[in-house]
Amino acid sequence: MGRGRVELKRIENKINRQVTFAKRRNGLLKKAYELSVLCDAEVALIIFSNRGKLYEFCSTSSMVKTIEKYQRCSYATLEANQSVTDTQNNYHEYLRLKARVELLQRSQRNFLGEDLGTLSSKDLEQLENQLESSLKQIRSRKTQFMLDQLADLQQKEQMLAESNRLLRRKLEESVAGFPLRLCWEDGGDHQLMHQQNRLPNTEGFFQPLGLHSSSPHFGYNPVNTDEVNAAATAHNMNGFIHGWML
């Protein structure tokens, strides 16, 4: 009697599942070995258990070389297909950007008043509206710039005026006592000159004794009546009496 067909589904019993895994694993490794020996094939087998334990078989001396060979064979076609796809996408992107650049260049020429022959009436009206909008924005920005400059100049003017007031105040404070001191000095000089004017002039009244004089002198020069009258007149004019008349 032959073996019954096993239903392919997950074995719920943990022990039975582990026993089945061990049997099938060993059988698979044996089949891989037989295939590599009988058919001279390069076989690599990698198995991970449900707990993450690794089981492997490689017919060559290096599993890494076999895996690299597999990657070159499997992913080379994918890379080639990807390269073709990328090239096509890049070409479409180039065409899109080229059309965009041509449109911008044409718009620039239209803004400069060039190549207007191909534009319709609606296009010309739209272009006119765009130019008017641009002019409004430019004038508004220019006006704002001038107002900002004017505000800065007014602020600087206020700062300079304030500095001027401070300097003027300091100058007035420093010069406030100078006129009084000047008057005091002028008054002192005037008083000194007044006292000098009041000093009696004895040069005309006392003369040195001359050796050639034949008449004796007693230390003064004889004064006649006219000189006395002149002295009195001087007293009346100057408001004071000479010392020799006291």
From Swiss-Prot:
The entry's biotechnology remark is: Combining natural and engineered alleles of J2 and EJ2 provide a wide range of inflorescence complexity that allows breeding of higher yielding hybrids.
Question: What residues does the MADS-box domain cover?
Answer: 1-61
- Every copy of the K-box domain together lies at 87-177
Keyword DNA-binding appears in the UniProt entry: yes
GO molecular function list: DNA-binding transcription factor activity, RNA polymerase II-specific; protein dimerization activity; RNA polymerase II cis-regulatory region sequence-specific DNA binding
What does the UniProt keyword field contain?
Answer: DNA-binding, Nucleus, Transcription, Transcription regulation
> What does the entry list under GO cellular component?
nucleus
Location in the cell: Nucleus
What protein am I looking at? MADS-box protein EJ2
Species name for this entry? Solanum lycopersicum (Tomato)
